[in-house]
Amino acid sequence: MMELIPQPRTKFLRVQCPECNNEQIVFGSPATVVKCLTCGKVLVEPRGGKGKVKAKILEILG
């Protein structure tokens, strides 16, 4: 059966920085590099679609 209302394929992720253990919510398909707000380490890099996550994923949010 066809979906009447399509759901988005993109998600938000709750990730934990490997350096300082700061938890941060990031977009799974970013257009720019996402850095940790505390220490500045790169958490997610854009890859032309879904981003390359370089941090531990704690939770996938809606």
UniProtKB/Swiss-Prot annotation:
InterPro entries xrefs: Ribosomal_eS27, Ribosomal_eS27_Zn-bd_dom_sf, Ribosomal_zn-bd
Binding site for Zn(2+): C17, C20, C36, C39
SUPFAM superfamilies: Zn-binding ribosomal proteins (SSF57829)
Cofactors that this protein relies on: Zn(2+)
GO molecular function: RNA binding; structural constituent of ribosome; zinc ion binding
Zinc finger (C4-type): 17-39
GO cellular component: cytosolic small ribosomal subunit
Alphabetically ordered keywords of this record: Metal-binding, Ribonucleoprotein, Ribosomal protein, Zinc, Zinc-finger
Entry annotated with the keyword Metal-binding: yes
Cofactor note: Binds 1 zinc ion per subunit.
A GO BP entry: ribosomal small subunit assembly
Keyword Ribonucleoprotein in record: yes
Family: Belongs to the eukaryotic ribosomal protein eS27 family.
Oligomer and partners: Part of the 30S ribosomal subunit.
Record-given protein name: Small ribosomal subunit protein eS27
